[in-house]
């Protein structure tokens, strides 16, 4: 069997500033929305007081240990590392006229370290960590002013790193703003849909402005969007279930439609009309939105099912995406259903819809790891999960889908986004820290470290099909 992965395919991992860096007030950094949710994106929003602490304040101390960690990534053979720039390191309050030089200098050092090993950076401009100053003073993305603040930030980092970064993403999992409005757009969790969609509109305009700025300032760079790829199957072949899956998938595909096609799709006009939502969209907004992305990136962890059956729906109360379990799939320790074939399906679906290159920028298994008496960590469950998903990526490439690369989520253990846990481990590299923040922060290679090293070295030929 021929190897489907093209020669230019990028292999690596993905991390986010607020989940790895720590140093949460170091070198002039301001408070972010992430700092006000020390228990994760679905946790309570708290006011930070001097002397209090959250696990993300130190995280895995990547801010100080990045040379060691990047050396480990290089040992695995990474050709790409997805990171995010903490907006609050560059503009601590979000609305300053001038950037924070100490923050800019940190990422210069980080990119130089990656370049030393030939690892290409893939940089997310905003990954669940907008400046809290913009929320407190201006109402977050509910205020049109935030568009200008984001554009200033984007132009600042484009100018600074134009020779070091050639692939960019605007907003991480932008469609999650519907379900986690404080994390996504800086609005209170109980905000009504009209307010959330208006904030999302401002975010979409800001994303498009960043795309245009990138194209103007770094002509040889590419910039993409980033979606949470949550494909929802109909639970049954009942036509009502099939139609419901169409409606619910459009809830997140809407973001891609705007960012790829440059205008609001017709089905959203109907939705807004029926919901009584009137957005403030200016003629300039419509013009700005025409700046479309070069490629589509997405996270993929699971699929789900949807139904119109009220008895089945009752089981989903409190489920953020109103998914019902798929009876044909197994689940992880955290209840996330495992569906490798769903990744091939999603890749084909998105490519058929948009005809744009795709980049899988998050995929991984959160699990509890055990250190054996000899110090080894035998995470065969993680190897099996990643192997099966990568096999399906290869199948999608054989199907004719253009896939730029694969950066698995959490190549090193980090603080989980949803509940700020260390025990939910994704990494090939173990970090000695627990949910209470105790531990030496020592790094240790897991069995999966050597497995991924082999996969990359063979360009996917060692995958078990």
UniProtKB/Swiss-Prot annotation:
EC number: 3.2.1.86
MF (Gene Ontology): 6-phospho-beta-glucosidase activity
Pathway membership, UniProt: Carbohydrate metabolism; beta-glucoside metabolism
Entry's Gene Ontology BP terms: carbohydrate catabolic process
Reaction catalysis annotation: 6-phospho-beta-D-glucosyl-(1->4)-D-glucose + H2O = D-glucose 6-phosphate + D-glucose
Highest taxon listed in the record's lineage: Bacteria
Chloroplast is among the record's keywords: no
Positions of the catalytic residues: 173, 362
Swiss-Prot/TrEMBL keywords: Glycosidase, Hydrolase
UniProt keyword Phosphoprotein present: no
SUPFAM superfamilies, per database record: (Trans)glycosidases
Pfam families recorded: Glyco_hydro_1
GO cellular component: cytosol
Disulfide bonds: none
Family: Belongs to the glycosyl hydrolase 1 family.
Protein name: 6-phospho-beta-glucosidase
Organism: Dickeya chrysanthemi
Source organism phylogeny: Bacteria, Pseudomonadati, Pseudomonadota, Gammaproteobacteria, Enterobacterales
């Amino acid at each position: 069997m021929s190897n489907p992965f093209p020669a230019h395919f990028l292999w690596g991992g993905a991390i986010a500033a607020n989940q790895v860096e720590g140093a949460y007030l170091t070198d002039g950094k301001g408070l972010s929305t992430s700092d006000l949710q020390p228990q994760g994106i679905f946790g309570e929003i708290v006011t930070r007081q001097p002397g209090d602490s959250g696990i993300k304040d130190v995280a895995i101390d990547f801010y100080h240990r990045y040379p060691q960690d990047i050396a480990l990534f290089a040992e695995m053979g990474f050709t790409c590392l997805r990171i995010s720039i903490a907006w609050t390191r560059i503009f601590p309050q979000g609305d300053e006229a001038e950037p924070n030089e100490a923050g800019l200098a940190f990422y210069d050092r980080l990119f130089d370290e990656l370049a030393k090993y030939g690892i290409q950076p893939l940089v997310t401009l905003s990954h669940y960590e907008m400046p809290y100053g913009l929320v407190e003073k201006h109402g977050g993305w509910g205020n049109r002013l935030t568009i200008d603040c984001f554009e200033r930030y984007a132009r600042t980092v484009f100018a600074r790193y134009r020779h070091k970064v050639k692939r960019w993403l605007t907003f991480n999992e932008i469609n999650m703003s519907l379900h986690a409005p404080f994390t996504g757009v800086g609005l209170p969790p109980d905000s009504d849909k009209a307010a959330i969609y208006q904030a999302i509109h401002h975010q979409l305009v800001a994303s498009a402005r960043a795309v245009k700025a990138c194209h103007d300032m770094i002509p040889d760079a590419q910039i993409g969007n980033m979606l949470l790829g949550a494909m929802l199957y109909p639970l049954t072949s009942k036509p009502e279930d099939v139609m419901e899956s169409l409606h619910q998938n459009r809830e997140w595909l809407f973001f891609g439609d705007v960012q790829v096609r440059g205008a609001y799709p017709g089905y959203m006009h109907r939705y807004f009309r029926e919901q009584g939502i009137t957005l403030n969209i200016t003629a300039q907004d419509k013009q700005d939105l025409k700046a479309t992305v070069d490629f589509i990136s997405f996270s993929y962890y699971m699929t789900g099912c949807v139904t119109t059956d009220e008895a089945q729906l009752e089981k989903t109360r409190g489920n953020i995406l109103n998914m019902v379990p798929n009876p044909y799939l197994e689940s992880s320790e955290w209840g996330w259903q495992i569906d490798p074939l769903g990744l091939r399906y999603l890749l084909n679906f998105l490519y058929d819809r948009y005809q744009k290159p795709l980049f899988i920028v998050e995929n991984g298994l959160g699990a509890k790891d055990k250190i054996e008496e000899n110090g080894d960590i035998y995470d065969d469950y993680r190897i099996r999960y990643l192997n099966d998903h990568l096999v399906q990526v290869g199948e999608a490439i054989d199907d004719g889908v253009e896939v730029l690369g694969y950066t698995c989520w959490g190549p090193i253990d980090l603080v989980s986004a949803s509940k700020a846990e260390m025990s939910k481990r994704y990494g090939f590299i173990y970090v000695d820290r627990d949910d209470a923040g105790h531990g030496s922060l020592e790094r240790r290679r897991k069995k999966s470290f050597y497995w991924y090293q082999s996969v990359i070295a063979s360009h996917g030929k060692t995958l078990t099909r």
